[in-house]
Amino acid sequence: MNRIGQIAVPAKDIERATEFYKDKLQLPLYFNTETMAFFECDGVRLLVSLPEKEEFAHHSSVIYFHVEHIQQSYDELTSKGVSFIDKPHIVAKMGDTETWMAFFKDSEDNTHALMSEVKVG
C-alpha cells in the first residue's frame, strides 16, 4: 500500500449531501448517480453515498480537511451555513509549528474538521 485512493462517507440524503460537499465545501464534483457522488480532494477521491447495506449505515471517520488559513476558512464556511462544533483552536505545538483545528458537522451528521499547521516565531 502506498496511498489512499478513495474515502467513503455515508449519506442519508444523497442530494442534500452532494449539495453540501459541492456548494458549501466547494469540492469539485467528478460525477454523481442516484445513490452516490464522487468528489476530488487533492488527489484523493471522496465518495459520498447511500449505504449499500445496513452494516455500512454509520457515521464516517473524521476527515481532516487541510486549509492554509483556518480562521478565514472557518468564517467563509460559517457564512455558508456550515454548523461548527467549536471555534478554531490549537490542539498541539511541535517546535515552531502549531496545529489548529475546528470541528463541524456535514449535512448528514458526520463530524469532520478543518486543520491548519501554522509556523510561529
List each model region and its residues.
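N-terminal beta-strand motif that seeds the catalytic metal site of vicinal oxygen chelate
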Residues: M1-E15, R45, S61-I63, S116-G121
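Vicinal oxygen chelate
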Residues: I4-K12, A37, E55-G121, ...
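Amphipathic alpha-helical segments
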Residues: E15-P28
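Alpha-helical segments within the soluble intracellular
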Residues: K22-D23, E40, T78
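Short secondary-structure junctions
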Residues: Q26-F31, F84-P88
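Conserved short beta-strand elements that form part of the metal-binding/catalytic scaffold
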Residues: L29-S61, T111-E117
